[in-house]
Amino acid sequence: MTAQPQVLTIRRPDDWHVHLRDGDMLKTVVPYTSETYGRAIVMPNLAPPVTTVEAAIAYRQRILDAVPEHHAFEPLMTCYLTDTLDADELERGFQQGVFTAAKLYPANATTNSSHGVTSVDNIMTVLERMEKLGMPLLVHGEVTHSEVDIFDREARFIETVMEPLRKRLQGLKVVFEHITTKDAADYVREGNSLLGATITPQHLMFNRNHMLAGGIRPHLYCLPILKRNVHQQALRELVASGCERVFLGTDSAPHARHRKETSCGCAGCFNAPSALGAYATVFEEMNALAHFEAFASLNGPGFYGLPVNEGTVTLVREESVMPETIAIADDTLVPFLAGEAVRWTVKR
């Protein structure tokens, strides 16, 4: 029997999907990401959303101002697609190195997405420009029609939006973000080199029973919502397979405690403090630690055409307990796995 590893040292990872928010929240959460990750794809769903080059430059500076001096961190900015976005503005930002990618939110799919796209037909000119530029399209893959069950919205999106779009624009580079279903796992596995995907730690570790059975756990509520066990298992098998087009994207999405623990709570898990160790735990459980570094540190840069990070990060098998809360201004955050023992800890 092979002895359990006590230390994991990997090339410094990146987070290919994170929400850093703004204001006091941004100042609180940025260090949790910048401490561990060399780069992060920053979501643009502020209020108002990031739709111009100038707004992205200003937001990037606010992020950098919140990075502790001893952290080496590069925020990679994204443009929020709307029905009326100017393709020339998008191209200008991409050519100037301000925008790394553009984000497609179906209108009202998640937090601050009311400005999102009502139909991909409305942004076809923009998407054609992105295809020409080789600019990645990041997709929140859910339909938002009220008659479609919330647990079916990702599968329906593949059928009615994603596949028709990729057939129409066959040179478009697409990241299917935070996939949650066997349908999506199969779709990505069978896809070509222009289709990538991110997966969150919560969707690998938990299913809807964990969120709903024996009491509602609002801090596991995120969008896309946790699915049944068969889907969780499909995601775990996908990462364990070593698929080179699947990479780390935490979708860390902080909300103040009072906005989660309420009669109509917000969607999102603040997992930045524990995500890397959580991923390592899943890979170990799947006997797939041989693929952990690629998932965390190599596959994302490979898909985006960027160099891998210099330096390394070390995780140690050292059980620690996640704090119950994290202070923010005059409120608190409840982190993912709050109060729970975690198996792998990033060595500081």
UniProtKB/Swiss-Prot annotation:
Record's PROSITE patterns? DIHYDROOROTASE_1, DIHYDROOROTASE_2
Residues that coordinate or bind Zn(2+) 1: H17, H19, K103, D251
| Name of the protein in question | Dihydroorotase
Q: Which gene encodes it?
A: pyrC
Q: Which GO terms describe its biological process?
A: 'de novo' pyrimidine nucleobase biosynthetic process; 'de novo' UMP biosynthetic process
CC cofactor note: Binds 2 Zn(2+) ions per subunit.
N6-carboxylysine modification sites? Answer: K103
List positions binding substrate: H19, L20, R21, N45, H140, L223, H255, A267
Give its E.C. classification number.
3.5.2.3
Q: Which cofactor does it need?
A: Zn(2+)
**Pfam families attached here?**
Amidohydro_1 (PF01979)
Q: Which residues bind Zn(2+) 2?
A: K103, H140, H178
Q: Which UniProt keywords apply?
A: Hydrolase, Metal-binding, Pyrimidine biosynthesis, Zinc
Q: Organism's domain of life?
A: Bacteria
Q: List the catalytic residues.
A: D251
Function description: Catalyzes the reversible cyclization of carbamoyl aspartate to dihydroorotate.
Does the record bear Hydrolase in its keywords? yes
